[in-house]
């Protein structure tokens, strides 16, 4: 393990701050409507959607983004280990090329970006724009930090892996053969309970078409994840993140 830059060590807190700022745009004048509510009549005016179908289409988009984010992060964590995912230090003793890492080098960060897109529909338009751009740029920053560390740590095998596997957007087919790691789904799902809770909230409560209710569900999911993180042991073997 290696001590990491501060913006890597405190990445969970910084993500939380970015999402908080995104929601805080509601406090600005003339910014009291959710992006969901603003986009619905805009799509209706395009002539392709009725008001009802536009509302439902945006909800389905949010559900798909939230669910895909939760699945990708849990899938990646099942191979990587929740202890490594949550560690403040840089980890890279072994090259992991299993599960989602056969299709993208950064399934966790891609999942986080999709999660930001889902939450953006609950924010004001300016908050949504800020969040998607800020979270996207922050993912790139974290990726570059990790790539420099892993290239120095693992050498040519990692560079060869990078040539074959996309950095961010997953490929439909695996790009490398499996390395033999086994997934541990229970600890992964528990470690990603926040993402899972948000995805379930969108799927279950989204049909009430209430952005404020969904925002409360996000906060409840966050609280549950903080409690679990405080009590969950971190004894996982070190892989690349």
Question: Residue spans of the language-model regions?
Answer:
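Membrane-anchoring alpha-helices and their flanking helix-loop junctions
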Residues: 1-98, 114-241
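Conserved SAM-binding loop
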Residues: 104-114
């Amino acid at each position: 393990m290696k001590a990491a830059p501060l913006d890597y060590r405190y990445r969970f807190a910084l993500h939380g701050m970015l999402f908080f700022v995104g929601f805080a745009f509601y406090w600005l004048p003339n910014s009291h409507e959710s992006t969901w509510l603003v986009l619905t009549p805009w799509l209706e005016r395009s002539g392709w959607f009725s008001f009802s179908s536009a509302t439902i289409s945006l909800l389905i988009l949010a559900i798909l983004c939230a669910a895909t984010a939760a699945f990708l992060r849990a899938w990646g964590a099942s191979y990587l280990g929740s202890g490594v995912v949550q560690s403040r230090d840089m980890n890279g003793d072994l090259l992991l090329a299993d599960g989602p890492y056969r299709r993208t080098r950064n399934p966790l960060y891609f999942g986080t970006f999709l999660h930001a897109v889902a939450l953006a529909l609950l924010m004001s338009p300016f908050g949504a724009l800020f969040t998607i751009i800020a979270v996207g740029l922050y993912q790139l920053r974290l990726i570059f930090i990790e790539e420099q560390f892993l290239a120095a740590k693992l050498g040519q095998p990692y560079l060869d892996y990078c040539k074959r596997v996309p950095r961010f957007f997953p490929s439909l087919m695996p790009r490398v053969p499996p390395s033999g790691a086994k997934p541990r789904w229970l600890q992964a799902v528990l470690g990603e309970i926040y993402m899972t809770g948000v995805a379930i909230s969108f799927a279950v409560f989204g049909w009430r078409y209430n952005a404020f209710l969904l925002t409360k569900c996000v906060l409840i999911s966050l609280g549950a994840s903080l409690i679990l993180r405080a009590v969950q042991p971190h004894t996982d073997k070190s892989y690349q993140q």
